[in-house]
Design a protein with these regions (language model features):
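C-terminal helix-coil-helix/basic helical segment that borders enzyme active sites and/or dimer interfaces
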Residues: 343-394, 490-503, 522, 526
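Extended, charge-enriched "interface" segments that sit outside catalytic cores
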Residues: 1-81, 85, 571-576
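N-terminal leader/propeptide and maturation segments of large enzyme subunits in energy/redox metabolism
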Residues: 17-61, 148-154, 331-349, 355-377, ...
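Internal helix-loop-helix
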Residues: 59-60, 90-167, 210-212, 436, ...
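A short core secondary-structure module
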Residues: 199, 203-245
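Alpha-helix capping/hinge segments and adjacent helical runs
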Residues: 2-6, 10, 17-19, 102, ...
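C-terminal amphipathic alpha-helical interaction region
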Residues: 112, 454, 466-576
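A glycine-rich, basic-preceded beta-loop-alpha segment at the flavin cofactor/substrate interface
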Residues: 39, 241, 248, 260-292, ...
Length: 576
């Protein structure tokens, strides 16, 4: 029997992080549920033990059910008939197994049937599911919608929907439209208040909706007549049982084929308002998207793990010139870099998740009582860290997942191009990761302000101030030099206009990420030898990557920008 949690000691290691004691204590609000609910922990150790046991259950289901089903699900896919979607048989089996195990609603309060887990084990579960089947991870991960309802909906709506989600009712977040993709301010699906029926009615079309035929939908719609911007949008919850929504078609996709992506038609579909009018995009969707981006970070790490394991396994099994190909420097370098990127992504994932955990726990406590001045200050700090690290995580982890999937095929050679091996599916599944929930380019837009205002640099200096063991001193010296190089690169783009900064934004964000991820690997390696080799490999690679970026920025001028900008005036010639 395979267990995707027990076969990877790096996961359980995350529960030993020093910040976990604070996270668990805040999440459990000093363990007030103990004695009130079955299985509510009495202390930090009790809570961590529960996390560990549930991860074992999920790991076993991933290894024994989800992963064996993945190839057939990819082949079969969902079917759309008569305006409804039917999952592939394996997808339904996956969903049933996780529902019966009671692992939906991991992070929701116990009063609604959840387990009240912190975000760290929830994200870990998402990583496990993604390693098994990245497509199914979308269906399972859309329980994130419950977090939004819990945070912003009325008590009545919470009581109506949250217990159902915890029991396995599926969700979707219906945001994008044919003319509103990344630019959600352009959403035009109309929400109209019906005085006679005393309800909201939704009319219009949604496109590229993951798990589009879900039982429970969160829908972004235009409630304010005559508006054209984000301030006219509100957020609604819809129950499939109420009728009024049909599936026009499902998309024929490159990858994640088990996850149905649908175009939907709303015709007088009844819905309930979530929170306040006009805050749909500027508050509620932004919160949901941050959670979704964290989820894609976990999905990316899971895909990276799957790609690396397949490549390593094949490299040991495949013999050429009378020896396993893992013995050739060209191959073992590739594998070492794959592992370093994987472990660096995982380090950034859980660092980001810990920041999210702390500020979310404080926000939950603030709903019950007034925070002390010290708590408010702490909350502000971790909220800023979460905002800084989330776009960096989403960009870096998804890009590395694509690179690792690409290299996994390369290790397999011609065999990797064939469907007999899972790496071609992993490669196809990985491609969406840099696109949905905000492209890598949009993550750069979100992250660059933390470069220009010095926030990343300040955090790097915090890591720099930490003591390291003698064996890591040389690596730290390299990072100190790389930090000075990063400062110089930042100064080089100042006072040259917004377009110039935007042009170099990705290079600058990546430079910061390489330094941060190197430090995180060194920090992990201080207490776990499993990270030591990757800390060395990644830091040395990061130095080379940053040298290239710094050199390009230093030799670039405003005049050089014109050669790139000229492409705006080119068009593809078409025959009449």
């Amino acid at each position: 029997m395979a267990n995707f949690y027990k076969d990877n000691s790096e996961l359980k290691f995350q529960f030993s992080h020093p910040l976990m004691e604070k996270i668990v204590t805040l999440k459990e609000d000093n363990f007030k549920d103990f004695g009130k609910y079955d299985y509510a922990p009495a202390n930090v150790e009790d809570a961590i033990d529960s996390y560990d046991k549930v991860m074992e259950i999920i790991g076993e289901i991933c290894g024994d059910v989800l992963a064996p089903n993945a190839e057939q699900v990819d082949h079969d896919g969902p079917v759309c008939e008569n305006g409804r979607i039917t999952y592939a048989a394996g997808t339904q089996q996956n969903h049933d197994a996780l529902t019966q195990a009671g692992v939906y609603g991991l992070s929701l309060p116990r009063e609604y049937g959840g387990l009240n887990f912190s975000m760290v084990p929830y994200v870990m579960a998402a990583e496990l599911v993604s390693r098994a089947d990245a497509g199914f991870a979308n269906i399972w991960g859309l329980q994130d919608c419950a977090e939004t309802l819990h945070e912003f909906a009325s008590k009545e709506i919470k009581e109506e929907f949250l217990p159902r989600i915890n029991k396995g009712d599926t969700c979707s977040m219906d945001l994008t439209e044919p003319d509103a993709g990344s630019d959600l301010q352009a959403v035009m699906l109309k929400a109209t208040w019906d005085e006679e029926k005393q309800m909201w009615l939704l009319n219009g079309v949604k496109r590229f909706i993951t798990n589009g035929d879900a039982e429970i939908k969160l829908v972004l719609a235009r409630s304010e007549e005559g508006t054209t911007d984000g301030r006219g949008l509100s957020y609604f919850v819809y129950d499939k049982a109420w009728g009024g929504v049909t599936v026009r078609r499902i998309e024929n996709k490159l990858g994640i084929k088990g996850s149905p992506t649908a175009e939907l038609v709303f015709k007088n579909a009844p819905a309930k308002l979530v929170g306040d009018r006009k805050l749909g995009l500027i508050k509620y969707v932004m919160s949901l998207m941050n959670g979704a981006r964290l989820g894609v970070g976990a999905q990316s790490v899971g895909v990276s793990e799957a790609a690396y394991r397949e490549a390593l396994k094949y490299a040991h099994e495949r013999f050429q010139y009378k020896k396993a190909i893992v013995n050739f420097p060209a191959v073992y370098e590739m594998l070492a870099v794959m592992k370093a990127k994987l472990q660096a992504s995982r380090a950034l994932l859980y660092e980001t998740t810990r920041f999210v955990d702390v500020y979310k726990a404080y926000n939950a406590i603030a709903d019950e009582r007034k925070l002390t001045p010290e708590e408010r200050q702490d909350n502000k700090k971790y909220s800023k860290y979460a905002d800084m690290f989330t776009p960096m995580l989403k960009m870096m982890a998804s890009e590395y997942a694509n690179q690792n999937a690409y290299d996994a095929i390369q290790v397999h050679g011609g065999s990797g191009f064939m469907k007999e091996y899972p790496v071609e599916r992993i490669y196809r599944d990985a491609r969406i990761l840099t696109i949905y929930e905000g492209t890598s380019q949009l993550q750069t837009v979100a992250a660059i302000r933390y470069v220009t205002n010095g926030s990343y640099l300040a955090k790097i200096k915090e890591y720099e101030a930490m003591e390291v063991k003698p064996e890591f001193a040389a690596l730290k010296e390299k990072l100190v030099a790389m930090t000075a190089q990063f400062e110089t690169a930042c100064e080089a783009v100042q006072d040259k206009g917004e377009e110039y900064i935007d042009f170099h934004a990705r290079r600058l964000v990546e430079m910061a990420a390489h330094i941060i991820m190197s430090y995180l690997l060194i920090i992990d390696a201080q207490s776990c030898d499993a990270f030591a080799r990757s800390a060395e490999v990644y830091t040395n690679k990061a130095q080379a990557w940053n040298n290239e970026r710094a050199s390009y920025i230093a030799s670039f001028s405003l005049e050089n920008l014109a050669a790139f900008a000229a492409i705006k005036d080119e068009f593809v010639a078409e025959e009449n």
